[in-house]
Amino acid sequence: MFVTAYLAFIVLAGLCVALEITARRLTLSQATQTAVANPAFQRFQKLFLKAYLLALWADWLQGPYLYKLYRHYNFLESQIAILYVCGLASCVLFAPVAGWLPQFLGRRQTCLLFCLAYSVCCITKLSQDYFMLILGRVLGGLSTSLLTTTFEAWYVHGHVDIHDFPKEWIPVTFGKVANWNYGLAVGAGLVANLFAEWLGLGPVAPFLLAIPSLAACAWFVLSEWGQEDKQEGMNGDKNAPLLNSLNTPKLQLSARARFWRSCVDGLRCLLSDRRVMLLGGVQALFESVLYIFVFLWTPVLDPHGPPLGIVFSSLMAATMAGSTLFRLATSAPYRLQPGHLLCLAILLAFFSFFMLTFSTVPGQPRPRESLLAFLLLELACGLYFPAVSFLQGRVVPVERRAAVLAWFRLPLHLLACLGLLALHGEVSGSGAGEAGSGTRHMFAGCAGMMLAALLAVISLFTVGRNDADLRLEGPKLEGEI
């Protein structure tokens, strides 16, 4: 498996480079060229990317060796499943808080809170106390919720309200973030492998390595973003005198009222539009399975001795390849529809889990087939996320999108928690641990969920058979990744 992992990484890295070069030749849009030529936009974009990419780097560093760390501390698989459930449950609980905190504390201050909470989360990994590790997972859930909302909220506010750049340029920045994000994920796996295995520092090393990145992120937010916020105070907020005349309790009440109204409006939008509900069902089914996969890939492969950091980088390279294939497939020469690519992604994911039910038979494991199945699943993820993002942009109203997506994430995390709890119960009941059939049964269940997701997609396109919103027309949509 050692040689197989390195060979897979080399092949996938070469494939990603070739696909990216081809995609850039075919998909450079006019809006991208205009934005690149604007020096003020470039300066603001770099200001945002410095801090945000450091935050993403710190997050990715913790991916390859989390399960390995808990096993290093001699916890059972059932105990580790509970730790993962605590992290997912905290994401559910803190998701509303993550949307409200920027209004209460301010966007920049909430980004600083993210850096602090995630740093403490990393420090807890030094402890072998189970309850301290649970606390770390709870803080990790809070940090993940803040990472996915607060940084982007600061950027969009500055882009639209302060600098008054065209809204069409926002996808240019987030397209760049997406491209960098995959590269950071691949690099994080390599660096984590270097420190944990080549230098012999153990599975806790990547978590400690993330702390300086979080500190650097906090420094950029304090210093450079602070200067930006001062500029906003001088030039950007013409309503400041009026706002200052109001008392603080009323402002806080208004923020709460806006938050709850957005939640109710999002739920009403979800229940009133069948297209939105079906798309939410697809997202809940597909992405909850991904959370289960994140838990299971390490115990499936680790007993056979692969370098986990290299395997992680290979998985992320497969996702990057899928994302680039999406850009190519929807570009002018091919014009494939995102809905068709979404169906393809779900079929690939189903086939991957179907393979895994046979490659993880107790007593007869086939780790190379399992690795291939995991790589196919990540390729499917690369196709899935931009396709779903396109459909969300077409069927969910812009003003309600954040609230609707928050409601999407609720069943997503609940399904993942139930899956991990079911695995915990089966492992605990059989006493077989990784040698039992719980993992195989879980993969079979995931395959069933993929079939349900496929039925939901078919229903979505049956409902919207003649709906132009579900189709890509004209020039390729800007910001698709």
Swiss-Prot record:
Recorded GO MF terms: molybdate ion transmembrane transporter activity
InterPro entries according to UniProt: MFS_trans_sf (IPR036259), MOT2/MFSD5 (IPR008509)
Residue ranges crossing the lipid bilayer per the database entry: 1-21, 47-67, 80-100, 131-151, 180-200, 201-221, 276-296, 306-326, 341-361, 371-391, 403-423, 443-463
Subcellular location: Cell membrane
Keyword annotations from UniProtKB, A to Z: Cell membrane, Ion transport, Membrane, Transmembrane, Transmembrane helix, Transport
Its membrane topology: Multi-pass membrane protein
GO annotation, biological process: monoatomic ion transport
Primary location recorded for the protein, binned into one broad class: membrane
GO cellular component, one term: plasma membrane
Record PANTHER family: MOLYBDATE-ANION TRANSPORTER, SAM (S-ADENOSYL METHIONINE) TRANSPORTER
Role noted for this protein: Mediates high-affinity intracellular uptake of the rare oligo-element molybdenum.
Protein name per UniProt: Molybdate-anion transporter
Protein source organism: Danio rerio
